[in-house]
Amino acid sequence: MDYADYDKALYYTHRSQWDNLLILMVRTEDDLLSKRIEHFLHAYHFEQDYAVLEKMLYSLLRYIDHATELTYEDQIALLT
């Protein structure tokens, strides 16, 4: 997967750029990232319970962290 997608997702989430996050959700080839973004945006727009929104946000951020760690390790393995 493209490391830039995870970087963009983190940036758009931090800056509350939901339109750009939605575009990234459609364009990324990482199905799990797309699904996490979808769940977060749905909770952001429709959920009344803040705890659910917070859970979806943390789920998205944990996945981004996990995926970037794996991507970084793959890049190091290619260089050695």
From Swiss-Prot:
Protein name: Uncharacterized protein YhdB
Organism (species): Bacillus subtilis (strain 168)
Underlying gene: yhdB
Entry-linked InterPro entries: YhdB-like (IPR025431)
Pfam families listed in its UniProt record: YhdB
